[in-house]
Amino acid sequence: RRTILLTAAAMPMIGSKVFAATPNQGASTVYFSKDINAENFLAIYDRLRKDANLPEDRRLSGIKLHGDDVDTNRGMWEALLNHIPNSKFVECNYASIYPAGRGNTQGNIRAITAQGVDKNRLDILDRNNEYTEVPIKGGKELKSVSAPTALLKEYGCVAVTANFRIPSFAGFSGACKNVGIGLASGEGKTQVHGLGVRKDARFFRRLADASKGIHDAMDNRLLFINVVSNIHVDPLKGTKVRTGNLGIVGSLDLLAADQAAADLIYGLTPAEYNAYSLQEKIDRGFLQLEYLDEIKAGNRTYKLITL
């Protein structure tokens, strides 16, 4: 059973449950702010960057931008861009099976800059058509995945910032999807989607595998922040779901970041998430959490620190 370790300052409600503080050395740290604004967004980034203890170097800092979701909480993303020296918004091309529009670098640039993003502050990581096949330790469906070499070589840090979206092809779109698909190359995305682009358990396996491979290849240079706002979900038997603007969560642990975001909505234990039917777990995205845990891509146990 998962326990959430809390600071003495707060013991927040997570769904319909309150989790008591219990000693657990294996827990990952998750920072939480109930109020969704630029100040707290930046504060969580600063804490994560400090905790990551990344060396100062001349490489770029990236901020993951979702090219189809530029306007949601846009002011927060722009504030972070202005806050981080030598930073750019980063995005990758669509899957190679969709070569038009955002499926090629120039089309991607046109689509994003048409939404008002400064071309000089945007880096499409596929720009050089140079890719690295990164290995996936413990992958169940994939043993490697293609990622842009520019990401791996030119960036000292990337903040994987996501509007935690429901619904999504993956049930929800958070840290896992924004790494395993979002930071994969066009070919890498096609590897993850597979033949026929079917939303089935094997897709979730490949998504978890790719997330772990790219995360490991970046050697802990990824920071994860989920903005859980404007949430609308259908009722779920066994819990009282929460909707609306629920807060911001951030972690150096990919799985913990998504687990904490899901917990704000559903408030379940890992065993309770896992007990739902396969179809429910596919529809809700719970399989992301289960499969990431199985391949040791992160921790479902976390210490929640309220800022």
Regions found by a protein language model. Give the residues of each.
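Extended, low-polarity segments enriched in aliphatic/aromatic residues
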Residues: 23-307
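N-terminal export signals
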Residues: 2-21
